[in-house]
Amino acid sequence: MEKFFIVGSHGLKGEIKVSGAKNSALPIIAATLLTREPCVLENIPKLEDVNIMLSILKRLGSKVEFGQLLTIQNNRINELIIPEELARKIRASNLFLGPLVARFQEGVVPLPGGCNIGNRPMDLHLKGLRLMGAEVEEKSGFIRARAKKLKGAEIHLDFPSVGATENLMMAAALAQGTTIIRNAAREPEIVDLQNFLNLMGAKVKGAGTDIIKITGVNQLKGVTHKIIPDRIEAGTHMVMAAATQSDIIISGVIPEHLEAVMAKLKEAGALITSGGDWVRVTGKSIIKPVDIKTMPYPGFPTDMQPQILALLTLAQGTSIISEGVFDNRFKHVEELRRMGADIRLESRIAVIKGVPKLTGASVIAHDLRAAAALVIAGLAAEGMTVLEGIKNLDRGYENLDLKYQLIGAQIKRVNGEEKY
């Protein structure tokens, strides 16, 4: 079982290059099922979640080659059931349902796994597919959807769910007629998916707004597409710089995707400048308290909540964070308390009373973003932190430890009983 040894590291300096967006890569990998022609994807991060999605494709009959580029060919699909043991590992396995029904008239997915951060039901996905004419049955932990030909429909999402928006966009791309998704998610990753689908020959417009219109076509073609940079990885590095009073340039980013995080870090006292594809963060010795409510994009991202909470444990004053997207997303709090943080939880609200310092401790990462928060806390703390559960970190960050070593951070990956 691998773990990190992290020694408090302040005043880091250097540049960190951001990898491709995990949350773009996963739906776009699923979308390749919409064509029998080969698709070539650039800037795909080498992550555990990506590997699981590719394993699922291979089990369905796809030919996959993953080196510098990712090439996928889906001309010999011979299985329409997503394997349960793989689906259990990743929530995004449900994104195969829309493409399978659209191209092969049927798909079967087990109820998916991934990070256990509260109730993330598939109801909105299934409601949309039913409106498009699919027959959907839920039985013994599996969902089966069938339709001879999906039909365009008007779909109003009760909540701007990213996964439901993506699944329905993909399904609608090969449907007969026009589909309109209202109250659609507006995340940059949705825009990236639209761009990929349109390169393939789909007719999708409106991504990035809350109304997306898709006019179905008969078939789609293979294309080459470059994935956008990962805004959550970028935001994580920005918070790390602020927490460790470091001066870091984060490159290969789209600054407009980071506006909510930049605004809150400025409020907390960090100095931030940005240019075409970079953001520079200089952390200051005094961290100011900040109040935050996580919301769907363009609000403050729930995927950045654990990281900024770690920063605010060191603020001079009291901060309040309201989790507006998921319940059960405060698993990092108990671990931060072990390091000396003063945090009170009330349902979906965390009240964080800043302390003068955190102290290294043995902690466990229970999910992906909690892992990132604990890395930040470990680097900001005095002494050594031992972080277990880093397989959760590897699901969404490509070589985070190596990237941080390059700017001078003392972070070391070890196996099992190995000592620092």
From Swiss-Prot:
Phosphoenolpyruvate binds at residues 22-23. Its main location: cytoplasm. Keywords: Cell cycle, Cell division, Cell shape, Cell wall biogenesis/degradation, Cytoplasm, Peptidoglycan synthesis, Pyruvate, Transferase. It is found in: Cytoplasm. The active site is at residue 115. GO terms for molecular function: UDP-N-acetylglucosamine 1-carboxyvinyltransferase activity. One of its GO terms (cellular component) is cytoplasm. Pathway: Cell wall biogenesis; peptidoglycan biosynthesis. It catalyses: phosphoenolpyruvate + UDP-N-acetyl-alpha-D-glucosamine = UDP-N-acetyl-3-O-(1-carboxyvinyl)-alpha-D-glucosamine + phosphate. The modification 2-(S-cysteinyl)pyruvic acid O-phosphothioketal is found at residue 115. SUPFAM superfamilies: EPT/RTPC-like. Its EC number is 2.5.1.7. It is an enzyme of class 2 (transferase). UDP-N-acetyl-alpha-D-glucosamine binds at residues 91, 120-124, 303, 325. One of its GO terms (biological process) is regulation of cell shape. Belongs to the EPSP synthase family. MurA subfamily. Cell wall formation. Adds enolpyruvyl to UDP-N-acetylglucosamine. This is UDP-N-acetylglucosamine 1-carboxyvinyltransferase 1. It comes from Carboxydothermus hydrogenoformans (strain ATCC BAA-161 / DSM 6008 / Z-2901).
